[in-house]
């Protein structure tokens, strides 16, 4: 009886270890796709940051190329989101926190959509409006702050499979960047309201800076999701080692 009990216990432990290893493998595959997704979003953000200067310089060819690049990247991000949805569906209940992974993929997809929307609205604002109170420089700085935030997300996900603790530290840095973005956003809002008299132009510019701030909020949501993934991976590694 004791021998049978020990054998059953041994088999149960092996099954738990095997299931745990499979889950970690499935999660690593999902994280690799998320990393691919965030890389593309980072590239789109960098292209977006060049747009204000091109608009001021009336670089029509450059603007056209930038808008095409951003639209193409958004499509790539959507395809990656569909891929991760299929992959997570295929493994079924193997990944315990699959909802978190899917939500992260969809939120990153939204960030890609924000970049496309901002680029479109920005390209339809008059040059004279963008030059108001040096808004072109302020816009570039605001977008670059969000690009810094996305870059941090890229660093976080790169460290997820290597050092979960490092991921959590990096996630805290995104919060500081978000606070800087909020401060810059408030200052720019006052500048826009005081400096732009044309109603249509005012609404367009206000929409642009609000969308940039909302995009930063979405980046913070992704950062929070990465913390949950980091904690999950750390916990699973502890179980497998035991």
Where are these regions (language model features)?
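Cytosolic, long alpha-helical scaffolding segments
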Residues: 2-242
């Amino acid at each position: 009886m004791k021998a049978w009990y020990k054998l059953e216990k041994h088999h149960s432990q092996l099954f738990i270890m095997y299931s745990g290893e499979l889950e970690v493998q499935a999660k690593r595959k999902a994280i690799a796709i998320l990393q691919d997704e965030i890389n593309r979003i980072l590239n789109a953000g960098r292209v977006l940051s060049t747009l204000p200067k091109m608009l001021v310089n009336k670089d029509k060819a450059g603007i056209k190329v930038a808008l095409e690049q951003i639209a193409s990247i958004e499509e790539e991000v959507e395809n990656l989101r569909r891929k991760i949805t299929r992959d997570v569906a295929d493994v079924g209940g193997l990944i315990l926190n699959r909802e978190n992974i899917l939500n992260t993929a969809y939120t990153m997809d939204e960030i890609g959509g924000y970049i496309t929307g901002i680029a479109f609205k920005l390209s339809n604002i008059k040059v004279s409006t963008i030059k108001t109170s040096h808004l072109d420089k302020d816009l570039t700085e605001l977008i670059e702050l969000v690009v810094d935030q996305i870059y941090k997300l890229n660093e976080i996900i790169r460290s997820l499979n290597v050092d979960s603790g490092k991921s959590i530290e990096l996630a805290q840095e995104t919060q500081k960047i978000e606070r800087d973005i909020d401060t810059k956003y408030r200052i720019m809002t006052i500048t826009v309201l005081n400096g732009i008299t044309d109603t249509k132009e005012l609404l367009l510019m206000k929409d642009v800076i609000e969308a940039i701030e909302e995009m930063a909020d979405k980046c913070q949501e992704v950062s929070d999701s990465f913390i949950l993934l980091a904690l999950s991976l750390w916990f699973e590694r502890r179980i497998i080692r035991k």
